[in-house]
Amino acid sequence: MRKSAIALLALSVFLCSLLPAQNSGSDAYVKAMTTPDANEKARLLKDYLNNNPGAQYENFANAELCTLQYTGKTPAETIRYGERALELGGLDALKKCQILTLVASMYVSQGQNLAKASDYAAQIAQLARSNRNSDLAPAATWNQLIGAGSYLQGQALEKSKNYRGAVSAYIDAYNVLKNPQIIQDLLKLGKALYDGKAYKDAETALKIAATNSKDFASVYLYANALNKNGKTEEALSYYKQAYLKQKSGAIAFNIGIILAKKAERDASFADEALKYLLDASFLSQANSQKAMQMAESLYFLSRKDVNYNGKVQQLQESNKKLENLTTTFNNKFGEKEEEELSDSEKSEMKSMLKQIEVEQETIKRLTAETQAALEGFQQLIESTKKRLGIQ
């Protein structure tokens, strides 16, 4: 019994000897946290961690050093203190989101540990969604954190060349934050994807830019992506929007091609197709000749009342027939005087002369009609030049 009493007394003395040390550590932490000067606070917190390894408030001290702005602080310190705080745990969701945001941002800005940065960013969005109804912060703050997490993830994925994943993350971020900068990020990604012939992903990236900012570059590139993906009706709408913003020969040519294909099924689209093809013939150096040829072909094919091609064929046939008649006539009667001809020969000659006259009249008529059709097309060309201000 006496030995037990001595043992209990010794244990009490030992425990009492620990209390000043623990209280001293707690006092140091409280002093550091209540210090108003950021630089002094940082110094005191570092001393606290160095002098009290495994202390009760180690997680909070590391968390504070991660988020605190003080002179001489390096990205490496932000990362080190932040990851230590995350490792120790015990932080509320809001503080954890703040630390994850800072650490992920450091990794992204350095272009290092991008997979980890992406994972941290995803955790931010997930934590914020889970705590949207908590009392730690207003719902608006959690929404901002959801958007920030998605945006950071997009940056990390973009730097790691995972463009498809980056597009998805940026879209999530924009849907929450509505920040115009995200549109520019999506436009840049969309262009990279388009240049890499990833047209479906490019379309996804460019849609928000085209439908929200509506600037020329976004609308035109989005129209190109739609066109590459076979969505010609949607592409046509955005090409027209882009053409209103800037009279580009390339755009006019694309519009003309789409409308010309529609005109093959419905002639009512022919005039509009002609307008854009003729515009392209003057505005697009690369496609000028092809656009003019397409316009000419469409003009004559679509004018059923003119029947230009049919009349050209008739003209060729009449010319050939006239040539044959003339040759036959000359062979039979070219070197003979009329007095030398028999009555039957005179009758035949008269008949051939009548046929020659008929063909000559036919050729004259067809030539006038085809010339009128050509002049009609030329008038379209002149009106196009006038509309575009071309001398």
Regions found by a protein language model. Give the residues of each.
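Flexible helix-coil transition and linker loops at the boundaries of alpha-helical arrays
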Residues: 49-60, 86-98, 125-146, 174-183, ...
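TPR/TPR-like (Sel1-like) alpha-helical repeat modules
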Residues: 119-127, 243-244, 260, 268-287, ...
